Every structure is written in structure tokens, then in C-alpha cells.
Amino acid sequence: MAAWACSPASFAAQAEPGKGLVLAPRQDFVAPPAGSYQLPIIQPAANGWVLDGNWLPRRLSSYTHGALTMLSFVYTYCTDPMGCPLAYETFATLRRLVLADPLLHGRVRLVSLSFDPAHDTPQEMVHYGGSNARSKVLPWAFLTTYSVNFLKPILDGFGQDVEVELDDKGKPTRTRTHLLKVFLIDAQAQVREIYSAAFLQPEVMMTDLRTLALERAGLPRKS
């Protein structure tokens, strides 16, 4: 995996999908048919206290149980096109694909959780989400935490590294360096796949979602 440094800047112009952002470069890999393979359990999804868009405290487990979940960590002022904006645009593409898929419609949620609770208040996260944060058709939760003390156990539980860069005087800046990861979580809150930036391909992710949906429905696996 590669590390992507995200520089502080306004994300407002990029917060809505379809505004010039690009998805990850296409890979030659072609996913096998949905249901023809298994996704083993990697680890339990981490839990902890988060804040929703109304400043209400919620357990993260309420966003990782009961549905197939795609979760990523972001921060709203990241502008590196292969960092947080890539995660956002990929989720926006997934949302459109899921809504058009009868097997997945009503069975999938998206979660974007902030790396920077000091800046990314619930209001900032709602603004970052735009119309996607308000949609009732397919849940896309834009969450933050009270503080780094609440965030760190969640990051540690997922194995998501992040570093705050220092300036020439050794003082913290607002630039965060992290490995872009997206976590696929099943309805029992078990992580079943972790995607890096290089493999953030909506078509592959859709096939994995369909595989877990078939598994949950108890339908025969394809040979």
C-alpha cells in the first residue's frame, strides 16, 4: 500500500460527486462471479462512541451491525486526489450502483468517519456529505468523535494508522498522513475485506457485496 499525504484546504468544491474527481486507476484484475468465492473473517469491527450529524452520541456498532457496511476514515479538508476524495467518490459511485441492484437495495450502508474531531464537527461532516448525508434512500453516515481520545481506540481496533505531520519547529500541522483503507463489514460486524487505494474498484467492491448478500440470504454459492 502507498501512503497519501492530505493537505489542508477547503473540500467544499469537491464534496458532491461528479465534479472532476477520478476513481482509482483500473486494474487488469477481473473479479470472479459473485458467490463463486468466500471472504473469510479478518477481524471484528472496532466499536466506540461517535457523534452523528445532530451531535447525538452513538455506538459505532449501531452503524456496523445489521447491514453490509463500507466504512472509511476521512477528513473534510483533504485534497489529495488519491486520498480522502478518492474514498468519497468511490462511495458515491457505489451508492449509485447499489441503488440499481435488486439484491443489494436496502441491505447496504456507507460510513465516513473523521480522522480530525477537532476540526470536523458534526456540522462540518454534514456539510461535507452534502445531499448524500441527507438521503434516506441509502444510509450514508458522516460521523465524528468527541476528541482524539475517543477516536484512537477505534483507529487502533481497525488497524488504521495516521500520523500528524510536524512543521520545521516540531509543532503539529493540520496535514495527516495515512494509508487509505476501506473496510467491508458484514451484518454481524465482522471485517471481511480491506481495500487499499490501488484496489478501490467499485466493480470489485460490488461483487464482494453481492457475495456477502448471497451468503446472508443462504442462497447456493456458484461453482
Which functions belong to the PLM regions below?
Residues L86-I154:
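Structural microenvironment flanking redox-active thiols in thiol-disulfide oxidoreductases
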Residues R59-T90, L110:
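Short active-site neighborhood of thiol/selenol oxidoreductases, capturing the structured segment around
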Residues N54-W55, Q188:
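Residue-level recognition of short loop/turn positions
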Residues Q43-A45, Y63-M70, H105-V108, D120, ...:
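Extracytoplasmic
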Residues M1-N47, L51, K222-S223:
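N-terminal targeting signals for export/organelle localization
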Residues D156-S223:
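Thiol-/selenol-based redox modules, centered on thioredoxin-like
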Residues Q43, A67, V74-Y77, M82, ...:
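Sec/Tat-exported extracytoplasmic proteins
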Residues I42-A45, K136-W140, E165-K171:
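A local structural motif
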